[in-house]
């Protein structure tokens, strides 16, 4: 008799999922970088491609009608690939100075990961940050009690979300297969698409997410009705992207995994 299959691994995103409540670091640094180049985008416009590799994020924003116009107004010409590289290098420099400051764990992460490990699961992690950027984040997370079994970045796989290759690399490093025994948990549409493209289970987390986009103080200042409205909006965004499950809080994840295990 074959043993019943169970989920073997959870792959977490970083900013907005396990650290940096509201995914504030990339938003703030993108805003600072674009302003240094004479370009002003709204927070919503910066958030729209969030979850992509950062150079691809910059190119996506500058490829919009507004992005092209802002660039042409500032420089009297269209942008080129050298310009994308220049903006990216500026972004990296800005992020390097602040990323560790934004690496506080989101409430419930440490306890949830401990419970998942007790359930026998491996913990993978992936991010839109580069390996160099993560050198500043990983030690700060470890000091707070969070140390995933692996951390995969876009420069390792050469491709970022929504491709599945960072999930596949976690599977390779931790010897986990097939994809249906993997849960991808994140806080952006790109996270959901990445999980689906990998053939894994995709779970969207609302509290602390980029989709909600508020820092911890802003979120906690909301009344219950305002929180409920934001949660419903975020839930719809995740479900429209194809999420298998949407949870309000990361602490609900072990229960979701138990439900998935029952269905396998």
Q: Language-model features: where?
A:
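Asp-based, Mg2+/Mn2+-dependent phosphohydrolase catalytic module
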Residues: 1-8, 110, 114, 118, ...
């Amino acid at each position: 008799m074959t043993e019943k299959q169970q989920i073997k691994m959870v792959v977490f995103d970083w900013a907005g999922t396990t650290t940096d409540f509201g995914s504030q670091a990339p938003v703030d640094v993108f805003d600072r970088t674009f302003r240094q180049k004479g370009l002003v985008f709204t927070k919503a416009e910066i958030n729209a491609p969030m979850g992509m590799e950062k150079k691809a994020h910059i190119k996506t924003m500058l490829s919009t009608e507004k992005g092209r116009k802002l660039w042409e107004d500032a420089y009297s010409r269209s942008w080129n690939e050298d310009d994308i590289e220049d903006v990216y290098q500026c972004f990296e420099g800005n992020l390097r100075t602040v990323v560790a400051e934004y690496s506080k764990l989101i409430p419930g992460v440490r306890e949830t990961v401990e419970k998942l490990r007790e359930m026998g699961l491996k913990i993978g992690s992936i991010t839109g940050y580069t390996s160099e950027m993560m050198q500043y984040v990983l030690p700060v997370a470890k000091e707070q009690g969070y140390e995933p079994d692996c951390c995969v970045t876009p420069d390792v796989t050469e491709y970022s979300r929504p491709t599945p290759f960072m999930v596949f690399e976690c599977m390779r490093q931790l010897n986990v297969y097939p994809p249906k025994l993997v849960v991808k948990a994140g806080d952006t549409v790109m996270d959901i698409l990445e999980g689906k493209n990998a053939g894994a289970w995709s779970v969207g987390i609302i509290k602390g997410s980029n989709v909600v986009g508020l820092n911890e103080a802003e979120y906690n200042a909301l009344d219950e009705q305002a929180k409920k409205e934001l949660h419903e909006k975020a839930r719809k965004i995740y479900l429209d992207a194809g999420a298998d499950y949407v949870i309000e809080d990361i602490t609900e994840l072990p229960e979701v995994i138990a439900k998935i295990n029952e269905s396998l």
